[in-house]
Amino acid sequence: MKVIKFVYKRLLVRLYLIFLIGFVTTILIAEITAPKIPILGFHSIINSANPEDKIFKNQKIQVMNYPREEIEKFLDYLLLRNFWFLTAQDFYDYFIQSKPLPAEYIGRKSIMLSFDDGYKTIQTNLLPILEKLEKKHQRKIKVVLFINSGNLDKIENKSSIHLTCNDLREGLQKGFYDIQSHGLLHKKLTEIKTPDLIAELKNSQLELRRCTQDLDPNNQVAVHLAYPFGASNSKVEKYASQYYLSGYLYNGLIMKLGRLSNNYQIPRLTINRKHFPNRLINMAEKSYKLEKQDKG
């Protein structure tokens, strides 16, 4: 009898282990094969040949400066491969709200290119590249700018490190910029009092809309938010939802369709100068070709 019980227990253990291994394997395969959309998060785009053209001069964070010649190679590749450059509203409409995909995007890979903090080098170094590549490929690249409206420079001068309202208007009018919010003054939203949190969220939206109101007939400016420092919690999300349709993190993760349970926790890949064009291309190629109906 004891032998039978021992054999029975061993059999149960084996069956349990087989089930557990099968379950874990299934989860891993599902994670690996899940459809992905890369959402890349840049900051400053610099001219490496110009020693003055460095937003981040502190050695520890200089890595956030990305060379313009390298991003040009990457963007050129994306155009050659016919990528769809998503705006924040595109992502919300088609991958959160599950609106039917326009025929022109079916069968193409998609990517979102975002730039935080509103540095002047977006206008001086990135915009000319976007214009140059449009002439070359006869296709326009859309980039998402997450802007701290309180840090916008009021007047144009040589020492400016941030964009002006006129810069935003120019890029928007030319069809290159998708302008969204990054808070008012780049405060860590998880560490401030409720009135300050509301002010950060509300006033940033108001100022960006005031700047662009006559150029935004569809009210798509400042309807999405990227959290400063990528910092968020349930309280921040609660108040963000009163002003914005979605919220973006900065957590180094790729967006997996079918895995997004909260549209105020959209993941972004953190990009710095250590990500050479080939590495960015590898990230981009993880995007899958879109089908008629996909959902985050």
Protein language model regions, located:
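A general structural detector for well-ordered alpha-helical segments in enzyme core domains, enriched
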Residues: 74, 125-133, 163-171, 200, ...
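C-terminal active-site subregion of NodB/CE4 polysaccharide deacetylases
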Residues: 2-23, 27-113, 120-121, 190-296
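Residue-level marker for buried hydrophobic side chains located in beta-strands
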Residues: 113-114, 179
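Acidic (Asp/Glu)-rich catalytic clusters
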Residues: 128-140, 160-181, 241-242, 256-261
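Surface-exposed cleft-lining segments at the edges of enzyme active sites
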Residues: 150-158, 186-193
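Short loop/turn segments at strand-loop or loop-helix junctions that form parts
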Residues: 40-46, 147-150, 181-185
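Structural detector of well-ordered beta-strand residues that form the stable sheet scaffold
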Residues: 144-146, 180, 226, 248
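Active-site-adjacent structural elements in enzyme catalytic domains
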Residues: 101, 106-108, 118-124, 128-132, ...
